Amino acid sequence: MPFDRGSFTFAMFDIPAELPENLLDLFAAKKAGPLDAVTDEPQLGWVTGHHLLDTTINEESAQMGGSYYLTLRQAVRKMPASLLNAVCKREEQAYMRANELEYVSSKMKKQIREEAIEKHIQKMPPALSGIPMVLEPHERLLYVGASSRSQIDLFLDMFYQ
C-alpha cells in the first residue's frame, strides 16, 4: 500500500459536512464481495488498509490513532488478449472446417468471441487493484492515494454513496 512505504501521490479533500457516527458500519455495508462472485464486469467495494483481501471492517482493523485506513478495491476477471485471440482463431478454424468455408463472417467472429469469453472467463483469476485512503474524521480531511481524475472520480462516487 502506498501509505505504508515508499513515495506516493495523493489528493487531499476537505469533508464539508459532519461525518455520521456509524461511519465504519456504512463502509462495512459496502464491503468488497467474495472473489468467487467476480465476473468480467468490475466490482467495487471497501476493504481495510491492510491488504486487498481483508473485508472485515471494524474499529480494530480499520482505525489507528483516530484515523480510518481503508481501500476501495476493484476486482474484475479479464482474459489475456493473446489467449482470447488464440481461442478465437482455433474456434474459427473449427467452424470453417465444419461448414466447409473459406472465411468466417464478422458476425460469426463476434459470436465466437463472446462465446469464448463466456466459456473461459470464470477460469481466469480476478485482477485486483485498490485506491487507498486515510480519513481523519476530527479534522474532516480525506487523503486519497490517487492522482488521475478518473480514479478520483470513481473513488469519490463510491465514498459518497
Describe each PLM feature range.
Residues 20-21, 77-79, 150-152:
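Primarily extracytoplasmic ectodomains and periplasmic/lumenal surface modules that are beta-strand-rich
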Residues 135-161:
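Loop-centered beta-sheet repeat module
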Residues 5, 62-63, 134-137:
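Short, flexible turn/loop "capping" segments at secondary-structure junctions
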Residues 11, 132-135:
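Short beta-strand scaffold segments in enzyme catalytic cores
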Residues 25-58, 62-132:
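Surface-exposed, low-hydrophobicity interaction/linker segments
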Residues 11-13, 68-71, 140-146:
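Short cationic amphipathic helices and targeting signals
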Residues 1-41:
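Short Lys/Arg-enriched alpha/beta "domain-start" segment
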